């Protein structure tokens, strides 16, 4: 069975579970919990769910996500062991030398029209914007900084879409109780409910996104970490973690 068929089967099963047993998410320890989280996250992006309901659901989903990860033997990784999120690159640079984290009036539940820039942009060496490293002629891989469960993915983005982040992946870091957000990807190799370990490839750097695709946009990874405060994702500055992990690959 192809990956797309597997994902579709899991998704349809999740819809049945949610319709028949809405409270099961509190106890589920299967990949379905990732699919269910993805469904809520999609509704948050499109503002088709009440904020209070969304907050409560994310809070409920955390425990079973952690239980599923540990049941399946996921590799727990402490923060000081996080892995730099890019591999197979010749050189990189940080937007504004790493001073681009701006919280502003950001709120996770603003949907796709979030304000501020509570994350960091890592540019790759791609002057001609063909999505390939100018020195190697190959794509730059995006890998998971920590270990956890994929809880939200978008592979449907097309030019003209209003989705600000383009193609993205969100992974709930079980050990550090937070969500990693990787966006503007050109390709994605994971799906909701999948367990990923630190250093595992999840995608390739790209220029997808409402503004990034424009002529002035640069090929880069937009990455954020949102700590869970009782289920509420709160952005956290982590440039020191990025620089520390980068040193490990030099």
Where are these predicted regions, by residue range?
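Bacterial N-terminal signal peptides
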Residues: 9-19
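Zn2+-dependent peptidoglycan hydrolase active-site motif and core
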Residues: 136-139, 143-186, 216-220
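Small beta-barrel nucleic-acid-binding modules, principally OB-folds
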Residues: 120-134, 178, 183-185, 225-235
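Bacterial N-terminal signal peptides that target proteins for export
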Residues: 1-10
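Polar/charged, compositionally biased leader and regulatory segments
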Residues: 24-141, 241-250
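Conserved, short, structured surface segments that act as functional micro-motifs
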Residues: 162-171, 194-250
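A generic structural motif
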Residues: 126, 154, 175, 186-189, ...
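Short, well-structured beta-strand-loop connectors
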Residues: 141-153, 190-205
């Amino acid at each position: 069975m192809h990956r797309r068929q597997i994902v579709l089967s899991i998704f349809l099963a999740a819809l049945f579970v949610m319709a028949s047993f809405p409270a099961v998410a509190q106890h589920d320890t299967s990949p379905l919990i990732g699919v269910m989280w993805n469904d809520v996250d999609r509704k948050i992006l499109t503002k088709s769910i009440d904020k209070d309901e969304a907050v409560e659901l994310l809070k409920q989903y955390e425990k079973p996500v952690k239980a599923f990860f540990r049941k399946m033997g996921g590799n727990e990784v402490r923060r000081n062991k996080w892995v730099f999120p890019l591999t197979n690159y010749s050189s990189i640079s940080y937007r504004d030398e790493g001073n681009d984290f701006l919280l502003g009036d950001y709120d996770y539940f603003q949907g796709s029209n979030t304000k501020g820039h509570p994350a960091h942009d890592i540019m790759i060496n791609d002057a001609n914007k063909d999505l390939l490293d100018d020195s190697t002629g190959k794509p730059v891989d995006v890998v998971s900084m920590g270990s956890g469960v994929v809880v939200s993915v978008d592979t449907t983005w097309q030019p003209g879409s209003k989705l600000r982040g383009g193609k993205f992946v969100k992974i709930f870091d079980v050990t550090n109780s937070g969500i990693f957000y990787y966006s503007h990807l050109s390709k994605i190799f994971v799906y909701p409910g999948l367990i990923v370990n630190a250093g595992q490839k999840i995608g390739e750097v790209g220029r997808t996104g409402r503004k990034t695709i424009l002529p002035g946009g640069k090929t880069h990874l937009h990455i954020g970490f949102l700590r869970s405060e009782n289920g509420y994702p709160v952005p956290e500055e982590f440039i020191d973690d990025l620089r520390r992990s980068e040193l490990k690959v030099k």
